[in-house]
Amino acid sequence: MIPFLKRRWFLVSLATVLALGIGFAPRLEALAKLPGLRHLIVAFVLFVMALPLKASLMLATIRRPGAALLATGINFGLLPLTMWATVLCLQQGNLLRGPLGENLAIGLLVAAATPCTLASASVWTRKAGGNDAISIMVTVITNVSCFIISPCWLLLTANRNVNLELAPMVIKLGLLVVLPMTIAQLLRIHQPFARWATSKKPQLSILSQCGILAMVFLGAIMTGNDLRQTSIGLAGLGSFSWMIITVLSIHTAMFFVAFKTSTWSGLSRPDAIAVGFSGSQKTLIVGLTMAVEAGGSILPMISYHVGQLLVDTLIADRLKRKAEEPGEAETQGID
C-alpha cells in the first residue's frame, strides 16, 4: 500500500481534494472567492515549474526545429480542431445536454486550447527512451505563446457560449503564465542559483504539484456550488460519460497521429516519441485557470490530465519494452 501511495500520491490527492471541494462546497464558498488567491497560486506554480527548466537543452533543437514545430502544430492546431468538431457532433447528437452539458462542452474546448504540460511530457518522453529536448522546446513554445493562442481558440470555438473578452484574457494569461516563467529563467542566469534549482528539481516538482492541488480544490468548490444549482439526472450522467470518452479518445488519437506522422516524415524513433507525448499532452494549471475564467466546468481539464497520466504510462512502458536498446532507456529514468 505504501509503495503504491508513493508512486501515485498525486492521483490519490487529486481525487481527495476534488471530492472534498465538491462535497463541502457551500461551507467553503468564501475560500474560493478570496480576491487574488487563484491568480497567486497559478503564478507561483508556473514560477516553480519553470525554475528547473534548462534553456540550454533547446539549442540543439533550434538547429533542427522540424520535430518541435510538428508537435506544436498538433498540440495547438490539430487537437483543438478535432475537439471542436467532436463537441459540435456531441451537441448535434444531443449527447451533451442541459446546463451541465453546456459547461462540460466549454470545459472540453478549454482543455484543447491549453498548452503542453510543463513537466510530464518530458518525464514520459525520457521514460520511453525519447528525446526530451524536443519536449522541453514544445513546452516553452506553447506556454510562452498560450497567452495569445489559447484565448483566440476559445473565442473561435466557444464564442457563443462564453462571455469572453480577448484583450483582458490575453493580458491576464501573459501576467499569470508568461511573466512567472520568464522571471524564473532570468534567475537561472545566475549559475549558482541555476545549479541549486536543477539539484532541487524533485522537491520543486512536489511543491508545484501541491500548488496544482490547491488550484483544483478551489475549482472543485466552484464546481460543487454550480452542480447544486443544476439538475443532473440521467442526462447529466450521460453527458459526463461522453466527456470522459472524448478526452481519453482524443488524447490517445493525437499521440498516435503525432507518433506515426513523425515516423512517416523520417524522424528518428526518439524524436517521434517526443513529438507523440508533447503533441498530445495538456497542462492542468493553465487549463484550470482558463476554465474558471470562461465559466466552464473544470472536470474536462482534470479528466484530460488524469487520463493522459494513465494512458501515457501504458504507452511509455510499451515503447520502452519495444525499444531496440532497452538498457539505454532504463538508465535515463524519471525525475
Where are the regions that the model predicts?
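Alpha-helical transmembrane segments of multi-pass small-molecule/ion transporters
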Residues: 1-335
